[in-house]
Amino acid sequence: MNGKGGTHMAVMTFAAIDIGSYEVSMKIFEMSKRIGFRELNDVRYSLEIGKGVYSDGKIDSEMLNVLCEVLNDFKRLMQDFGVEEYRACGTSAFRELVNPLLIIEQIYQRTGMKIEILSSAEQHFLGYKSIAAIEKGFKKMIQKGTAILDVGGGSLQVSLFDKDALVTTQGLKMGSLRIRQRLQELEKTTIHYDKLVEEFIRNDLMSFQRLYLKDKDIKNVILMGDFITDMIFQEEMEDKIITREEFMKRYEDTVGKSVDLLAQEMEIDPEYASLVVPTMVPCAETLSIFLTSE
């Protein structure tokens, strides 16, 4: 990095590690005044930490072993890329642990990595910051009523913007892993299980609507969450905007299909495929409730 005469170009390499409820991911960025932000690497490992945590508040030792192995792999990658700083964050699965400090200490002993647990608000604030950074139209968009829907494994966060200000943020306990659990229980007993899940979500959303949407006209819904953008709508994501009709058509096409068929068609792992419908159901419900005026 040192050029002639020891001049030092200010380039910094930074890694962001996210331990989510169904995957562990790391992005490595290069930051400099000249080029700004550039992504160098993006690795993901499918690991369903949320599964045990949402049912009994614990991570079993097998899962912890795998997590530490993955983090050690990430460390080697960080060395390869010459990463100077990193931030490793645990999200909802960590928030619901019975003994988070003990787990964090164990991870530190075995990997040398310090994990921060982000509160729900911090997690979503970082999400908004990233939308605001990417979308030049964000400011203009939130002048009109806009709802942001962030679908995670453990929860669904709905935020409302009106006339440029954040009106409210509500967390609803119905993320994709929880919904999938419900689906799997219902699937055995009934044919139209997607309809039942829609009902179970609709109640939560309707009460949200009664409380917050009385006089608000929602014109835009922003869907967030890596899973939606990276997996489900890869090809539509050129301009990052799809109409409600396009979403609903996609939803109707998807909802009746088996996990194996989805995995085949989308060329993704069955583990991920099993989250497709549970991720789309709350989005579809939200769109149908919030965008009634369209």
Regions found by a protein language model. Give the residues of each.
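Short, Lys/Arg-enriched N-terminal segments with co-localized hydrophobic residues
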Residues: 1-8
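Helical "lid/coupling" subdomains associated with nucleotide-phosphate turnover
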Residues: 14, 52-76, 81, 93-97, ...
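Conserved ATP-binding subdomain of kinase catalytic cores across diverse folds
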Residues: 36-48, 53
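Post-signal peptide N-terminal segment of secreted/secretory-pathway proteins
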Residues: 84-86
